[in-house]
Amino acid sequence: TWGVDFALLDKDGQLIENPVHYRDERTLGMVEKSFEKISKNEFYSITGNQFMEINTVFQLLALKEKRSHLLERADVMLLMPDLFNYLLTGKMVTENSIASTTQLFDAKERTWSDKVINALGLPRKIFTKIVSSGTIIGDISEKICDELKIEKCKVIAVAGHDTQSALVSVPTTEKDFVFLSCGTWSLLGTEIDEPIINEKSSKYNITNEGGYENKASFLKNIIGLWLIQESKRQWEREGKEYNFSTLEELAREAKPFKCFIDPDDPIFVQAGDIPSRIREYCLKTNQEIPENCGEIVRCINESLAMKYRYSLEEIKDCTNKNYDVIYMVGGGTQSKLLCQMTANACNIKVSAGPIEATVYGNIAIQLMKTNKIENLYKAREIIRNSNDMSYYEPQNYELWDKEYE
């Protein structure tokens, strides 16, 4: 699943309440609140995580501050993928990659950080044993087998964070590469053997996540196609029905470089009238105001492409490496306009696909664990040969570079 969200269970293994999604205002101010208990530098040096109000740690801190009775009743916290594994098997464990999204995980020791947990006054007992991606958790319960009239089978903890399963499917042959997992969120980064946690990565607020085979991902979380998805929902509420293809065509026809937004501005996090918020942002920053759907979508796409360049430059500065290709995976690869704009803005070739990267990665981990595929290199080769990839070469870089400056 997506990262950071969780459920609390009581001593009988029952949900205390339904999980609450991270797009909720209860965590406002919790990042600053945490710095009263543990310094920002120490916090980052342990977890190596990008500070974002949505992170699990700040959700738990909000519960402690505002609804402490829930934490007092809780016996176990399970992140969303682990909750499904528990419902299937009855076993309570936490998979490594999803644990690393919580900002409660020691990135170097690859376990829960008692220092962070204790500093923030959170109950240590609710955190379960951490297991690696690819661990066989157990069998599907007899109750489910009887209900569905199926034979027993193994449940394998894949990379529970969807980005990390998607990363398994990146169709590369290189050790050093840049990926862009593009969906509701855009996650741009590189795969490394050990976390990068230093003054520079802290300044850039870059995150380290655990991945398959104990690899680490060094990446930036960027608000992604949420901006278009939520704009589309707003237009539907206004009686304007557009599919994504139509919106892309309207964007192609719109005036280029009319205005830019920072996709990560807090104004765009919550659900609602994103087009109005974009106009408000442009007004406040003394830019031209986008006046129709095409101009809004063009503004979003151009702004995302520029943000990808900005983040790529930060990644390169921290790794001291250059990259020849951006491997773009996920639903966003269906947008030819965004793929081309990404190549243009970053002045780098884009390889687009597979679309269903998370699914491919999920299946590949299970096949590797059951010895049907030899290793990660072979898995990526199979996925590459099973998909029609699209490639985009940079165009008009001088124009994009001028606008970027």
Where are these regions (language model features)?
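Short, conserved acidic/polar surface loops in the N-terminal third of protein domains
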Residues: 7-12, 32-34, 192
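A conserved helix-loop-beta module that forms one wall/lid of the active-site cleft
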Residues: 120-135, 363
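Glycine-rich beta-strand-to-loop/alpha-helix junction loops that act as flexible
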Residues: 1-4, 133-134, 182-185, 325-333
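Carbohydrate-associated surface elements
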Residues: 24
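Short beta-strand-loop/turn "lid" adjacent to the catalytic site in phosphate-handling enzymes
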Residues: 1-21, 50-54, 85-106, 129-132
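Structured loop/turn residues at beta-strand edges in well-structured enzyme cores
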Residues: 14, 125, 321
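Active-site core segments that coordinate phosphate-bearing ligands/cofactors
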Residues: 28, 35-48, 52-53, 58-91, ...
